[in-house]
UniProtKB/Swiss-Prot annotation:
Catalyzes the synthesis of activated sulfate. The keyword Chloroplast does not apply. Pathway: Sulfur metabolism; hydrogen sulfide biosynthesis; sulfite from sulfate: step 2/3. InterPro entries: APS_kinase (IPR002891), P-loop_NTPase (IPR027417). It holds the Pfam family APS_kinase. Belongs to the APS kinase family. It catalyses: adenosine 5'-phosphosulfate + ATP = 3'-phosphoadenylyl sulfate + ADP + H(+). One of its GO terms (molecular function) is adenylylsulfate kinase activity. Keywords: ATP-binding, Kinase, Nucleotide-binding, Phosphoprotein, Transferase. ATP binds at residues 35-42. It is an enzyme of class 2 (transferase). It comes from Escherichia coli (strain K12). One of its GO terms (biological process) is sulfate assimilation. This is Adenylyl-sulfate kinase.
Length: 201
């Protein structure tokens, strides 16, 4: 908060997070999907949201491309803008967790420091880092948006995995093999959510 905002105060809500969670029938949590472009983050997150929806779980999916059409439309891809992009998404995700939702976020989020920033904002026990680990060669072969081709041709600068670093998680809550079938990965995630009493068995 800026120094000139000392008169802005926090207002507590009469309905607590616990009451909202009781209403939904499950805990609020963020599943933070991270990995290279083309690793399968959005695909797996979308499939998991569909599975959770069928189970009656209240969810919301925040996708890296989609938020840049609105919430983060003023940001580019410099290190500073990428950090601000993740900060904003983290704040939105935190609000949704406080509303009792299971929030799925699919962002490359290449730097450990930014992912840690969101973890600390949301709070331990409510942040699940999901590392979708897919070899660069596989991601590049998939290249659904043609971005790797542009990066290799020098038409796209600061592209993660090519000329911009990706810092892989060192202790993610779950490490997924991005070459496996999506259905297998979704089942692994559902098992994790049940084991941690986030959703009912």
């Amino acid at each position: 908060m800026a120094l000139h905002d000392e008169n802005v105060v926090w207002h507590s809500h009469p309905v607590t997070v616990q009451q909202r969670e009781l209403h939904h029938g499950h805990r609020g949590v963020v599943l933070w999907f991270t990995g290279l472009s083309g690793s399968g983050k959005s695909t797996v997150a979308g499939a998991l949201e569909e599975a959770l929806h069928k189970l009656g779980v209240s969810t919301y999916l925040l996708d890296g491309d989609n938020v840049r059409h609105g919430l983060c439309s003023d940001l580019g891809f410099s290190d500073a803008d990428r950090k601000e992009n993740i900060r904003r998404v983290g704040e939105v995700a935190n609000l949704m967790v406080e509303a009792g939702l299971v929030v799925l976020t699919a962002f490359i989020s290449p730097h450990r420091a930014e992912r840690q920033m969101v973890r600390e904002r949301v709070g331990e026990g409510r942040f699940i880092e999901v590392f979708v680990d897919t070899p660069l060669a596989i991601c590049e072969a998939r290249d659904p948006k043609g971005l790797y081709k542009k990066a290799r041709a020098g038409e796209l600068r600061n592209f993660t995995g090519i000329d911009s670093v990706y810092e892989a998680p060192e202790s993610a809550e779950i490490h997924l093999n991005g070459e496996q079938l999506v259905t297998n990965l979704v089942q692994q995630l559902l098992d994790l959510l049940r084991q941690n009493d986030i959703i009912r068995s």
